[in-house]
Regions:
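Bacterial N-terminal signal peptides
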Residues: 9-17
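Sec-dependent signal peptide cleavage junction
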Residues: 16-28
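Feature responds to low-complexity, polar/acidic, surface-exposed segments characteristic
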Residues: 242, 674-692, 700, 705-752, ...
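Surface-exposed repetitive/solenoidal architectures
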Residues: 25-99, 116-118, 586-588, 651-662, ...
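Consensus positions within tandem repeat domains that build extended binding/scaffold surfaces
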Residues: 90-93, 113-116, 137-139, 159-162, ...
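Positively charged n-region of N-terminal signal peptides that target proteins for export
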Residues: 1-10
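Structural signature of tandem-repeat unit edges
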Residues: 50-56, 75-88, 98-111, 121-134, ...
Length: 876
């Protein structure tokens, strides 16, 4: 055991012999002069860790990479003593000496090099000697324990960041005679809360006090120049800049969150760029009468600035100069000539602003985002409403546009949701993209006769617009130009129109028909998609590019089907022979349940049947080559697909997108679909009559049947019980528990249906004890029953729109209990009135014939969300 212990001690002693004692591997002295062989300055380190320099003249400069001869001993150095005679301390001489506690500098010292004492974390105080003329960049940067500093009056050249990021520095004495404070000199010194600027000071460098804790400031009359961001982000609460300052640069006092008042002395001709931007507590500003210009971003993002007096001498307002301020009122001098882009944008409290007539230069987005602005006037000299001028002014109700204006810029009135009407001058020839996008309250609009061109989405989303005439000078309708104009019910297109862009009328849900001029040679895809009430598209016979077949838009050659009107009567459609391609969104939102494609079909484009959720059966030919992405809704009711080709060929069609159809769809291979037609079942049903689509729908859906044999009796009476029975069938004939108070229900076939309708609140009877099941249902009664079914059974609110019944000569004769339901049914297009030589009459108490009831039921079906199956279709 003793031998083992001895061996361990021997090994340890050998290892310790290899480890040098403190400074043993470092020279304890040496030369570091900048002159000749360097012997003009010598250095020594004593056992206490004091590094002493002696000699005359300049010390050598070093770099962070090269290091100093004493560098490896840096962490052991406790003090630095530079003796008299030495004139220059070299760059990086004491860089990152974390334990140095004191520095003694001689009166002979003239300059201190770059980063000489940077990151000396132990240094707490520093007295720079009089006679020092130059401080290099970052000389004392990040001396984070430094608390007290004296700056001599003799400094002439001060580098950047000399005392920046000294987080503990709180006591600074600037000697009289000092003329310049360097760039970023005290930047980031958050404990520096007070400082007295000497009367000799002339220049405050860029960012000199940036992000310091300064709370008070007195600028001496001697100061003539304050450079950019000099006091940015300080804790100042009040500032007065005297007129003796001749140069005040950008953002000098920006981001001072505690600054409440600011005075700019007489003599200043401009408020510099960003001078007070983001001063979030600023409330009071005093400007000089000598002022001529308020520059870019001068007061931007000062939300508490609610009022300001602008001198009459001001002629120019820069970009975003007052954006995002809290100003409620603003009076611009009559001599104003220039207003920069977004000068008054995003001011949530500004309600009104008058632009003087002298303005000749008007930037983009001047009022954009002023959410409280209700009215504004524009200068008579204006020839263009620039881009985004009033964009997102959600409370703007009126604007007077001068007659001199010839063009409306991009997004000029975008999202002005309260704008109800606007008078466009006769001279306007161009309205750019999205100029009136989402102006939801705009109900009246007369486009100028001189208009020649429109931009994409120029009037998209104007959901209140009801009628529109496009002037003859317009040759092209660009993409989405009137998209989502949901109330647009009347449209006149110019006779010389040559093209209709993609989605031009997409979402115009109130248009029932559209006539395409013979001159049109180009129609973009989706031009007429998502038009819920569109029943027919018309094209003249002389059009060389397009044709319509039974209201459906096709190319002149008949090879591409471009648009199927979503509200075209009928639930089935046989695509015409010769069609090879179904265009993108061609059947958007259609109420079709059955579609059969011709043998010529090759391609169904992307989203061709988007939102055609009522589809239940499709018939494809064997030659089909492509079915586009999301051509059919995955969540549709499609239950059967008939395909003329093989199972392998079908797999090749759908393999790239496994869920083009519902997962439970049944595919019938090498066969086609046969669907019975009402005209083939009943001898008194005419396939060309106005009521045929409704009859065909109700028969195929099992909602109505014949009255015996091959007779349907279209003009026969529809009873109250029959209507209730149809809705009961539509609901899947749910189980009924309980009865009714009605004593006149004598037949068995309608007992459950009427009990169900009574218990669900769909009907209430003609009295407390009678229902009159065999009485003919009147037009107003069927309206009440259908609206009740939508609300009580389907939980759907169809009451958003109500028609004005006074438009009908007999509108006043509608019973009070039925008035709302009839107004809703008319607005929804379920009841349209009967045309006579004396006008269009509602005939509310008139009986609804079977063909009328069938048509109303089909229209109702297109509006409600209810699953339905066709009664019968067979494979052939």
């Amino acid at each position: 055991m003793k031998k083992k212990l001895l061996s361990i001690l021997l090994v340890l002693s050998l290892m310790l012999a290899l480890v040098p004692a403190a400074f043993a591997a470092e020279p304890a002295s040496g030369t570091c002069g900048a002159e000749g062989d360097g012997s003009n300055v010598t250095w020594t380190i004593d056992a206490a860790g004091t590094l002493t320099f002696t000699g005359t003249g300049a010390m050598r400069d070093y770099t962070a990479q090269s290091g100093t001869p004493w560098g490896r001993s840096g962490n052991a150095i406790q003090a630095v003593v530079v003796q008299e005679g030495i004139t220059h301390i070299g760059a990086y001489a004491f860089f990152y000496y974390t334990n140095c506690r004191s520095v003694s500098l001689p009166s002979s010292l003239v300059s201190i090099g770059e980063s000489a004492f940077a990151m000396n974390y132990g240094l707490t105080q520093l007295d720079l000697p009089e006679g020092l003329r130059k401080l290099g960049d970052m000389a004392f940067m990040s001396c984070r324990a430094l608390e007290r500093l004296t700056v001599p009056s003799t400094l002439e050249k001060i580098g950047k960041n000399t005392f920046s990021s000294c987080g503990s520095l709180s006591n600074v004495t600037l000697s009289e005679g000092l003329t310049v404070l360097g760039r970023l000199m005290f930047s980031g010194d958050r404990q520096l809360k007070n400082i007295t600027l000497p009367q000799s000071l002339t220049t405050i460098g860029a960012s000199a006090f940036q992000q310091t804790g300064l709370q008070e400031l007195h600028i001496p009359a001697s100061v003539t120049k304050i450079e950019g961001r000099a006091f940015e982000g300080t804790a100042l609460t009040s500032v007065e800049v005297p007129g003796t300052v001749k140069t005040l640069l950008d953002s000098a006092f920006s981001s001072c969150d505690n600054l409440r008042s600011f005075t700019l002395g007489e003599g200043f001709r401009s408020v510099p760029n960003g001078l007070l931007s983001r001063c979030r507590s600023l409330e009071r500003v005093t400007l000089p009468q000598s002022l001529e210009k308020i520059d870019d971003y001068a007061f931007s993002e000062c939300p508490r600035l609610t009022e300001i007096n602008i001198p009459d001498s001001v002629t120019t307002f820069g970009i975003r100069c007052f954006s995002r301020t809290g100003l409620r009122e603003l009076t611009l001098p009559e001599g104003t000539t220039t207003i920069g882009g977004r000068a008054f944008a995003d001011m949530p409290d500004l309600r009104e602003l008058h632009i003087p007539a002298a303005v000749t230069s008007f930037g983009i987005g001047v009022f954009a985002g002023d959410s409280s602005l209700t009215t504004a006037s524009l200068p008579s000299s204006l020839t263009e409403i620039p881009e985004s001028t009033f964009a997102f002014c959600e409370k703007l109700t009126s604007v007077a546009i001068p007659d001199s204006v010839t063009s409306i810029g991009k997004e000029a009135f975008k999202n002005c949701k309260s704008l109800t009407a606007i008078d466009l001058p006769d001279a306007v020839t161009f309205i750019d993209a999205s100029a009136f996008l989402d102006c939801q309250s705009l109900t009246q609009l007369q486009l100028p006769s001189a208009l020649e061109a429109l931009g994409d989405q120029a009037f998209g989303g104007c959901i209140g617009l009801t009628s529109l005439t496009v002037p003859d000078g317009v040759r092209k309708l660009p993409s989405w130009v009137f998209s989502s104009c949901q109330s647009l019910a009347s449209l006149t297109l110019p006779t010389d129109l040559t093209s209709i862009g993609m989605g031009a009328f997409h979402g115009c849900r109130s248009l029932t028909e559209i006539t395409i001029p013979d001159s049109v040679q180009s129609i973009g895809e989706m031009a007429f998609a998502n038009m819920a009430r569109l029943q027919a598209i018309h094209v003249g016979a002389d059009n060389s590019a397009y044709q319509t077949v039974d209201g459906v838009l096709l190319t002149k050659a008949g090879d591409v089907l471009l648009a199927y009107p979503a509200a075209r009567p009928g639930i089935r459609y046989d695509v015409p022979d010769g069609v090879t391609r179904i265009g993108e969104r061609a059947f958007y939102g259609s109420g079709l349940m059955i579609v059969r494609f011709p043998q010529s079909l090759r391609t169904v484009a992307d989203e061709a049947f988007k939102n055609s959720t009522r589809l239940i059966a499709l018939d494809f030919p064997a030659g089909t080559e492509e079915i586009g992405t999301r051509a059919f809704n995955r969540d549709s009711n499609i239950s059967d697909v008939f395909f003329g080709g093989t199972e392998d060929a079908w797999y090749q069609l759908v393999k790239d997108e496994a869920y083009k159809f519902p997962l439970d769809v049944q595919v019938h291979y090498q066969t086609s679909m046969v669907v019975p037609r009402a005209a083939d079942l009943f001898t008194d049903v005419d396939a060309d009559s106005w009521s045929y689509p409704g009859i065909d729908f109700c028969v195929l859906a099992g909602l109505m049947s014949g009255v015996g044999g091959d007779t349907f009796l279209p003009r026969g009476v529809t009873t109250r019980a029959q209507v209730v029975q149809i809705l009961y069938n539509l609901s899947g004939e749910p189980a009924v528990a309980g009865g009714t108070p009605f004593t006149d229900l004598t037949a068995d076939w309608y007992q459950d249906a009427i009990a169900w309708a009574y218990q669900t609140g769909v009907v209430s009877g003609t009295s407390a004890t009678t229902f009159e099941p065999e009485a003919p249902v009147t037009r107003e009664q069927i309206a009440v029953i259908l609206m009740g079914y939508a609300e009580q059974v389907l939980s759907m609110d169809l009451s958003a729109d109500k028609a004005d019944l006074t438009a009908f000569p007999d509108g006043a004769s509608v019973s009070d209990w039925a008035r709302d339901a009839v107004a809703e049914a008319v607005a929804l297009g379920l009841i349209s009135g009967a045309q006579t030589k004396d006008g269009t009459f509602l005939q509310p108490q008139g009986g609804a014939t079977r063909e009328q009831a069938a048509t109303i039921l089909m229209g109702f079906y297109t509006l409600v969300d209810v699953e339905m199956r066709i009664l019968e279709y067979d494979a052939q």
